[in-house]
Amino acid sequence: MAEASPHPGRYFCHCCSVEIVPRLPDYICPRCESGFIEELPEETRSTENGSAPSTAPTDQSRPPLEHVDQHLFTLPQGYGQFAFGIFDDSFEIPTFPPGAQADDGRDPESRRERDHPSRHRYGARQPRARLTTRRATGRHEGVPTLEGIIQQLVNGIITPATIPSLGPWGVLHSNPMDYAWGANGLDAIITQLLNQFENTGPPPADKEKIQALPTVPVTEEHVGSGLECPVCKDDYALGERVRQLPCNHLFHDGCIVPWLEQHDSCPVCRKSLTGQNTATNPPGLTGVSFSSSSSSSSSSSPSNENATSNS
């Protein structure tokens, strides 16, 4: 609470965001009756002729982030949240007093106190963005403006080389649209990756070889061993006609033919109709070894091989 004085002077109410004359002796705002007020520096109270300065900020004295929300929320979908994310506590945007060209030699602390009402005025109206303004005494070449940052953000050309002073932005090394934004961004990337591997398996089997596959009946030995179709997992019935591959694995005709029309390989051991092991050197994946998966696949259904070898 400020000390009582004969002349209270001008104060700034942080609740109303206006300059006021406090109500004595409690030093509260006469508008909202709040005690959250701050005494303004002497040089901002009045001019030499005694006239009170206007509280309406000019275009030059207006904080540079006065309308930052309007700029950010007019960006394309997804960019607004992205732009707010880069403005953290370590990001500073310089502000310049009108007509200032050189350092006036005053203490930096006094300059911060002089500009304190403007910063609080902006902070009371824009509580969402955590922004820090830095006072400078002259405009320097190469310092980015807010309008320039927003424009480059829309154009997608911001890189660490164009704005080297933006530390948090350094994690982006390409167009922001190349990154996954939002809930559907990761799903789109996974779908794209899966589509790239869709046609990397064995090519379709030759139709003549598919038609030439022998059809054999299911025997009592097959039924007794609990033999089932590796595709649909249904048990074979006695006397049922099934297709036999060169690797001696048995399948239902409706299960194996559609598979062979897309992949020239056995679903169990990965051998093609010509006897080649497609799991060891699959087309499109040269240099990748699948020997362990091949051996495990071959040993996964010993009953199928034993049963067919005895047929």
Curated annotation (Swiss-Prot):
Pathway: Protein modification; protein ubiquitination
E.C. number: 2.3.2.27
Modified-residue entries (Phosphoserine), positions: 5
Name of the protein in question: E3 ubiquitin-protein ligase RNF126
Biased composition (Polar residues): 47-61
Region (Required for interaction with BAG6): 5-100
Location of the region described as Disordered in the Swiss-Prot/TrEMBL record: 42-64, 94-132, 277-311
Expression tissues: Highly expressed in liver and testis.
Annotated positions binding Zn(2+): 13, 16, 29, 32
Listed Basic residues bias regions: 117-132
Major localization class: cytoplasm
Start-end of Low complexity biased regions: 289-311
One example GO MF annotation: zinc ion binding
Biased composition (Basic and acidic residues): 103-116
Domain writeup: The C4-type zinc finger is required for interaction with BAG6.
Residues carrying N-acetylalanine: 2
Zn-finger segments (RING-type): 229-270
Alphabetized PANTHER family for the sequence: E3 UBIQUITIN-PROTEIN LIGASE PRAJA, E3 UBIQUITIN-PROTEIN LIGASE RNF126
Location of region: Sufficient for interaction with AICDA: 200-304
